């Protein structure tokens, strides 16, 4: 399964925020600079992450963005569920004439479930804790 760039950059943005001290705010501009992604694209991603509670956004002069909850409580599977369209096939009887007898959708759904269960066994904190190479690459002190 390949994640969309939306989910990929959502995970990267969360990893960046998780690598910062818990009370430190960052900005969308800073995140886009670190990853070289379009600001407009990142704004949409951060808005979605904010809607589901993974990011807190504060407006104003001293505003910015930061994790909406502790990194150790954010499971990677939950992030993917919030950002990724998880339907792998378009099973519509007008589109595919084998839909009534097809078993492929069930197998694919089980594969997605297994994938998400594996991601659920890892948190955002697991991605950043004791990872000095990551901090160096992200230029985080």
From Swiss-Prot:
A Gene Ontology BP annotation from the UniProt entry: negative regulation of DNA-templated transcription
Annotation: DNA-binding region: 28-51
InterPro entries named among the record's database cross-references: Tscrpt_reg_Rrf2, Tscrpt_rep_HTH_NsrR, WH-like_DNA-bd_sf, WH_DNA-bd_sf
Positions of the HTH rrf2-type domain: 2-129
UniProt cofactor(s): [2Fe-2S] cluster
Example of a GO cellular component annotation carried by this entry: cytosol
Residues that, per the record, bind [2Fe-2S] cluster: 91, 96, 102
Protein keywords: 2Fe-2S, DNA-binding, Iron, Iron-sulfur, Metal-binding, Repressor, Transcription, Transcription regulation
Pfam families with a match to the protein in the record: Rrf2 (PF02082)
Gene Ontology MF terms in the entry: 2 iron, 2 sulfur cluster binding; DNA-binding transcription factor activity; double-stranded DNA binding; iron ion binding
Keyword Magnesium: no
Cofactor notes: Binds 1 [2Fe-2S] cluster per subunit.
Superkingdom per UniProt: Bacteria
Function according to Swiss-Prot or TrEMBL: Nitric oxide-sensitive repressor of genes involved in protecting the cell against nitrosative stress. May require iron for activity.
Official protein name in the record: HTH-type transcriptional repressor NsrR
Taxonomic source organism: Serratia proteamaculans (strain 568)
Gene name as annotated: nsrR
